[in-house]
């Protein structure tokens, strides 16, 4: 028996003739894994084999059971049935500590970090306590430099953006020197250049024998990186393939049963400015924030303007200033439909026609313990009477409409927000704001964590909103997404905003260079300030 297996409880199924012993060479084997919840079967008879040194993709639409399956492997969720082998030895992993003892590390879609302590302290909690905090801090700095993941070990987690939190999770997993590494959407916060560098590292890890389970909705990444793929639909395995021999279209058919709709992005008819930001400069709210320096931005009716950039370069601070969470700006620095709004609270800005989708799903986008119907009330008040009474029937009907229109997999309008998968909650939050038919929509990471079919629908809805005369500002780290739906692009770096450039004239290489703040020399001819 492997030394790290000492003390682990063996599965009862190992004594059953129904499950023959797997090949001893396999790093991980799952057989007949089933997990039931009161309203749904998350996994049904799932079988999966991962070889040493293999980069194995797990594909599936939102709610297909991917995250539940990964949590079972990592010991966070107990299966109702099925067997698991690690390096040929049958095991039942009762908790993440036992998983880490087996050499299994995971980066979750929803992060497991304590807000009130520092990055280094969070990482230290999951490592061998024989290391001092100072040694862990040095290791974080070295690993961050090696992988191009900019992070300060001394920062409290509550000061980090969502993208920066994901970097912490990636570094924490890599510091455990895993033999099986589970990555859930690991590149959503990286520049194209950093993605390439991460892929070099992952291939090196695989060449050294580390197995990698890779969950991503970026089909081109899976085809470029992975050598095996298991597809889930409705909690069941529907296919196994070699993604290097598949096209994006064929992978989509395996995953959602059809090819995603093709967007037709025609030039829009722009109207009057609905958002104007003029010389916006704000000092950081805390020592770990980013100063905003001379931001000039304009979004007109009938256009989609995108802001690209690596997370942590001032996007959060800008979004707070635009949404009304930060009201320190002079009134005239932010104009909504011509009205000074820099000092207005979020509710007053909604009266002017602004709707906003934050990057944080739970906490800012939705209240975890409230139903989907009641979460509509965060930004919609038409079902509240003057006396404060709720029209519950109308509220539930409206929530049901969003659920149906955006194909949200949930137990109905009364389902609490925290019961949804990350992708399905994202669809509901984005759908809630789009269905309100705003004058101005500001959306951060509109398709973060959603499957290709849902992403295509959300992007189509954004373009339809634009064609109806809405002004849309999209902040995203998905360059493919920005190129697909935006009419103009900006890049944010170190608290400054680049000139805008017509999307048709932009390239991935140019935008990648601008992410480093190198736009002064390039901002000629094609680039222009939209102010």
Residue ranges of model-derived segments:
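Glycine-rich phosphate-binding loops of nucleotide-dependent enzymes
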Residues: 5, 11-531
């Amino acid at each position: 028996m492997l030394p790290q297996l000492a003390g682990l409880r063996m599965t009862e199924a190992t004594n059953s003739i129904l499950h023959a012993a797997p090949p001893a060479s396999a790093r991980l084997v799952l057989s007949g894994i089933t997990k039931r919840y009161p309203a749904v079967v998350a996994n049904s008879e799932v079988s999966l084999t991962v070889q040493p040194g293999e980069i194995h993709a797990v594909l599936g639409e939102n709610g297909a059971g991917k995250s539940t399956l990964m949590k079972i492997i990592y010991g966070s969720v107990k299966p109702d049935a099925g067997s698991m082998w690690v390096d040929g030895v049958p095991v039942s992993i009762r908790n993440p500590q036992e998983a880490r003892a087996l050499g299994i590390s995971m980066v979750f879609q929803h992060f497991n970090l304590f807000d009130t302590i520092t990055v280094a302290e969070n990482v230290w909690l999951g490592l061998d306590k024989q290391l001092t905090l100072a040694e862990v801090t040095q290791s974080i700095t070295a690993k961050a430099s090696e992988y191009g993941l900019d992070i300060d070990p001394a920062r409290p987690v509550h000061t980090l953006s969502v993208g920066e939190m994901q970097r912490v999770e990636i570094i924490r997993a890599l510091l455990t020197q895993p033999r099986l590494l589970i990555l859930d959407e690991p590149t959503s916060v990286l520049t194209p250049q950093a993605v390439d560098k991460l892929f070099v590292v992952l291939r090196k890890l695989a060449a050294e024998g580390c197995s990698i389970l890779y969950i991503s909705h970026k089909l081109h990444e899976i085809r470029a990186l992975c050598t095996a793929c298991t597809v889930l639909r409705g909690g069941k395995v529907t296919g196994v393939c070699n993604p290097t021999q598949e096209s994006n279209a064929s992978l989509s058919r395996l995953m959602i049963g059809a090819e995603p709709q093709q967007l037709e992005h025609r030039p829009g008819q722009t109207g009057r400015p609905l958002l104007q930001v003029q010389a916006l400069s704000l000092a950081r709210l805390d020592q770990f924030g980013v100063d905003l320096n001379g931001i000039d931005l304009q979004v007109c009716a009938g256009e989609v303007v995108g802001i690209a950039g690596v997370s942590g370069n001032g996007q959060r601070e800008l979004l707070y200033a635009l949404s009304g969470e930060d009201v320190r700006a002079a009134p005239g620095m932010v104009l909504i439909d011509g009205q000074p709004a820099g000092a207005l609270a979020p509710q007053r800005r909604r009266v002017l026609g602004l709707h906003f989708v934050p990057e944080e799903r739970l906490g800012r986008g939705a209240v975890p313990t409230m139903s989907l119907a009641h979460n509509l009330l965060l930004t919609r008040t038409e079902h509240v009477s003057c006396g404060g009474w709720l029209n519950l029937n109308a509220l539930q009907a409206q929530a049901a409409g969003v659920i149906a229109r955006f194909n949200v997999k949930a137990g109905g309008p009364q389902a609490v927000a925290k019961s949804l998968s990350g992708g399905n909650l994202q669809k509901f939050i984005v759908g809630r704001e789009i269905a309100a038919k705003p004058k101005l929509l500001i959306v951060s990471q509109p398709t973060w964590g959603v499957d290709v079919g849902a992403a295509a629908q959300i992007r189509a809805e954004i373009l339809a909103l634009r064609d109806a005369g809405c002004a849309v500002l999209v902040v995203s780290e998905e360059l493919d997404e920005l190129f697909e739906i935006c009419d103009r692009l900006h890049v944010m770096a170190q608290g400054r905003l680049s000139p805008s450039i017509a999307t048709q004239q932009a390239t991935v290489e140019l935008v990648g260079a601008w992410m480093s703040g190198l736009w002064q020399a390039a901002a000629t001819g094609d680039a222009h300030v939209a102010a």
